[in-house]
């Protein structure tokens, strides 16, 4: 079993006084169901799990009056082998997007407050909009993502103490011994090639076979394409799939990583395809980095909604869009050109997305200054440049010189830790997991 950080978040929810129902959100196949089942196994006497895709007729439980006593009674008749007891039974409603009345019922479970209820499902951002009465104010949220690099290291047998020692070099800004740095870069390249989808990571942990990982990645991508075909409106199906499958080309095959509609279709325009991007966003299939015209706080004041970069929600899905040879080049460190810079930028944004940062990038056509990633942390703007090699970060240096309110910026590269007189902190690519 792969260790996941989400377990600690669910424990915090359980220990909350007067807790609400917990909605576990996130893209498909990120481990939501598995984590909830394992948590119930370790923390409850009984798990009552209803998967509305598998048990289609279970919607009848929610077809009458949505009082808790009525719903519990219906559950007891449907599942007589289960003991449904307050505080001792976890009620888990999976694939809840298939039963709108179950979504409505969350309000009444929360008001009653006798039973612990967790719900999950994919595409919730879309289907909640169709709920007859969404329980605003009666649910807590936990968003799950694919496995991050630290969780990957746990899966590879690297202990938390070892990671703590590694972070010590980050805190003191001292050079990491070459033997450790070299091995960490090897792990990081493996992680980029595998991505963070739990099934792909588990397959690698078990087999160390990238061909087997590749099969998993391609199967996952087909599942996402199926979801588009199944859940998107008739108007959006084809357009959304075209946009989604263009992402690798948008970010790895050209120098300018801006999402361009002409890469979706010859002559493509925002008027035709922007609604499809919005659909993919609500479906947890993509996330965006928006252009900012200035690097001052608050970044959202300077963001342009029409100028953005689009990313898959996990590296595993990006890998499935490309030939197997890309994984070979990543692991063997033989990438060159746009692909090298693009894949490392992708990995850095993937890590920050999983840390729940809002992502931006900066580009000034007049001065030719460009910053790959801009975020806000602790009320400050942080500039991040990503380098395939250990080259200079001229735009970063120039912007920090002209914006005295920006106290530091990062350059992530193949190299080791270093701090320049200009305030630029150079870090190995893998250190993005620990800032």
What residues fall within each predicted segment?
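Conserved lysine of the Walker
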Residues: 32
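Interdomain motor-coupling "hinge/lid" segment immediately C-terminal to the ATP-binding subdomain
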Residues: 129-253
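Accessory nucleic acid-recognition modules appended to NTPase machines
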Residues: 202-370, 375
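Catalytic cores of nucleic-acid endonucleases
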Residues: 388-429
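Short glycine-rich substrate-engagement loop in P-loop NTPases that contacts/grips substrate
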Residues: 56-87
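Hydrophobic positions on the alpha1 helix immediately C-terminal to the Walker A/P-loop
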Residues: 35, 39
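N-terminal pre-Walker A segment at the start of P-loop NTPase domains
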Residues: 1-13
């Amino acid at each position: 079993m792969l260790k996941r950080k989400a377990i600690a978040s669910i424990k915090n929810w359980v220990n909350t006084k007067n807790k609400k129902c917990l909605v576990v959100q996130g893209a498909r196949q990120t481990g939501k169901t598995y984590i909830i089942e394992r948590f119930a196994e370790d923390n409850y006497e009984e798990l009552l799990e209803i998967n509305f895709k598998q048990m289609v007729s279970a919607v009848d439980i929610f077809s009458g009056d949505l009082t808790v006593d009525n719903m519990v009674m219906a559950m007891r008749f449907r599942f007589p082998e289960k003991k449904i007891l307050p505080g001792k039974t976890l009620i888990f409603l999976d694939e809840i997007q298939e039963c709108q009345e179950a979504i409505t019922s969350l309000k009444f479970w929360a008001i009653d407050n006798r039973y612990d209820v967790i719900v999950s499902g994919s595409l919730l951002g879309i289907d909640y909009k169709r709920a007859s009465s969404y329980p605003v104010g009666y649910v807590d949220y936990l968003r799950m993502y694919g496995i991050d690099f630290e969780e990957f290291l746990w899966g590879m047998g690297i202990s938390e103490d070892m990671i703590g020692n590694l972070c010590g070099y980050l805190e003191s800004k001292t050079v990491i011994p070459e033997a450790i740095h070299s091995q960490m870069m090897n792990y990081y390249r493996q992680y980029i090639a595998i991505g963070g989808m739990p099934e792909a990571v588990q397959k690698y942990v078990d087999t160390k076979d990238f061909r087997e990982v590749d099969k998993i990645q391609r199967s996952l991508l087909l599942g996402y394409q199926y979801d588009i075909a199944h859940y998107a409106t008739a108007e959006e199906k084809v357009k959304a799939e075209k946009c989604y499958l263009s992402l690798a080309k948008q970010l790895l095959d050209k120098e300018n990583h801006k999402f361009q509609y002409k890469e979706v279709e010859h002559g493509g325009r925002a008027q035709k395809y922007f609604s499809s991007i919005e659909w993919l966003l609500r479906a947890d299939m993509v996330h965006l980095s928006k252009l900012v015209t200035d690097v001052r706080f608050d970044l959202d004041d300077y963001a342009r909604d029409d100028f953005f970069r689009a990313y898959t929600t996990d590296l595993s899905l990006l890998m499935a869009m490309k030939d197997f040879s890309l994984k070979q080049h990543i692991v063997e460190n033989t990438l060159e050109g746009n692909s090298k810079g693009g894949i490392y930028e992708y990995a850095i944004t993937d890590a920050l997305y999983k840390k729940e940062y809002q992502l931006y990038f900066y580009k000034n056509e007049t001065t030719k200054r460009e910053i790959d990633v801009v975020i806000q942390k602790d009320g400050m703007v942080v500039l991040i440049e990503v380098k395939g090699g250990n080259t200079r970060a001229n735009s970063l240096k120039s912007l920090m010189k002209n914006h005295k309110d920006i106290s530091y910026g990062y350059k992530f590269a193949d190299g080791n830790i270093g701090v320049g007189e200009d305030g630029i902190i150079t870090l190995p690519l893998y250190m993005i997991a620990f800032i």
